[in-house]
């Protein structure tokens, strides 16, 4: 829940987009008018940049990422599952040799996010 007296942000009603904790920092920087560069894997929920969301969850074995219309299961090396984003039970794995362009891009984004994250953890660059 966010508040701003600035009507520019139109913070009334319910926003049904997927969001997560990593979106708080960039959202707050926009709300307070901070316009210097920041490092975040999240996105501002009040920006008009229309940034794509990447929702990340981990069970300490696999990363689960929601990107676009799909949920990707990643084991640290390979994507092992692709599910429709409405298939929250992960019951129908769509992973196949005939991936559509969105799924191929989602796999690349999954691996890129993980590589960037691990590089920053290992090299102590989480700033």
Walk through the language-model features, giving the residues of each.
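Substrate-binding rim/cap in mid-to-C-terminal beta-strand-loop elements of soluble/periplasmic
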Residues: 1-34
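Phosphate/adenylate-binding glycine loop and adjacent helical scaffold
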Residues: 36, 41-127
